[in-house]
Amino acid sequence: MNRLAVELPGLSLKNPIMPASGCFGFGREYARFYDLSVLGAIMIKATTKEPRFGNPTPRVAETPGGMLNAIGLQNPGLDKVLEEELPWLEQFDVPIIANIAGSTVEEYVEVAEAISQAPNVHALELNISCPNVKKGGIAFGTVPDVAAELTRLVKQVSAVPVYVKLSPNVTDIVAMAKAIEQAGADGLTMINTLVGMRIDVKTGRPILANGTGGLSGPAVKPIAIRMIYEVSQAVSIPIIGMGGIQTAEDVLEFFYAGASAVAVGTANFVDPFVCPTIIADLPALLDDLGIGHISECIGRSWKTGAHAVHCRA
């Protein structure tokens, strides 16, 4: 029995560990270090209809507990992803989750319909955290009704299950999650980055050319845990958790909060082997805690009658 196997809508995962979108590109650089087939899945970099060159530099800044980024969804565009990146990934025995983004509802729908037809794309990750709605400038990811309508329209055209990536930069993330579930989402991924800023003490100016950026890394982990804990008790669709994961112990904490799988982001920049290391470490950790299968950990922190976990002597 594979103690790490996880079944999610559209995804049969050999283990619940995957690199998060935006921290792994399309896998080419990491394939020089290890066989990508060891991963549970790969969340590829966000894809838009046309190529995007991203924001001006500098667009990355280190922080004491992680990093800020303002990349700006740089990507080669839909055609190149379909013609080059996804075919290259077919050599690996790993399901692909395609992260899609757009500036308009129409762009989201067009990209979703096209990329969901690729043979190795098993699910979509709907990135509603960055773009704005045409004719109004309302962020897709911060207004429940708008997020729900976008989810509904993408679901209508997608050939694979749709997971929606939630922004933590909202007043009520539970309300957002419920609206998206009611619109037909198959799952959630959370959390995306928090808006932050660093200022250069010598110049008095923001370090990032964009001014603000997305904070990720260990600093956001307690926020991610809290939000997953709340959302997982309010919805019935599965959650892929992310936000500051570095170790196998971090993975279990996310599972206890209510996640059914996890994505590792910023840690890939620190250690390119972090994902296979976590995968290798998980079985021994389960043994130490007397846990038979990783799925036993889902929601343990809040489920009625859940037994406490005690390390074996």
Curated annotation (Swiss-Prot):
InterPro entries in the cross-refs: Aldolase_TIM, DHO_dehydrogenase, DHOD_1B, Dihydroorotate_DH_1, Dihydroorotate_DH_1_2, Dihydroorotate_DH_cat, Dihydroorotate_DH_CS, Dihydroorotate_DH_I
Residues that hold substrate according to the record: K45, N69, A70, I71, G72, L73, N127, N192, T193
Free-text remark on how the cofactor is bound: Binds 1 FMN per subunit.
Active-site feature positions: C130 (nucleophile)
Listed CDD domains: DHOD_1B_like
Reported cofactor(s): FMN
GO-annotated biological processes: 'de novo' pyrimidine nucleobase biosynthetic process; 'de novo' UMP biosynthetic process
A GO MF term: dihydroorotate dehydrogenase (NAD+) activity
EC number assigned by the record: 1.3.1.14
Annotated S-S bridges: none
Entry's Gene Ontology cellular component terms: cytoplasm
Pfam families: DHO_dh (PF01180)
Keyword field: Cytoplasm, Flavoprotein, FMN, NAD, Oxidoreductase, Pyrimidine biosynthesis
Binding site for FMN: S21, K45, A46, N99, N127, K165, I191, G217, G243, G244, G265, T266
DNA-binding listed as a keyword: no
Subcellular location: Cytoplasm
Catalytic reaction list: (S)-dihydroorotate + NAD(+) = orotate + NADH + H(+)
Pathway(s): Pyrimidine metabolism; UMP biosynthesis via de novo pathway; orotate from (S)-dihydroorotate (NAD(+) route): step 1/1
Gene3D superfamilies, per database record: Aldolase class I
Subunit structure: Heterotetramer of 2 PyrK and 2 PyrD type B subunits.
Family stated for the protein in its record: Belongs to the dihydroorotate dehydrogenase family. Type 1 subfamily.
NCBIfam families reported in the protein's UniProt record: PRK07259.1, pyrD_sub1_fam
Role according to the record: Catalyzes the conversion of dihydroorotate to orotate with NAD(+) as electron acceptor.
Protein name (database record): Dihydroorotate dehydrogenase B (NAD(+)), catalytic subunit
Species of origin: Geobacillus kaustophilus (strain HTA426)
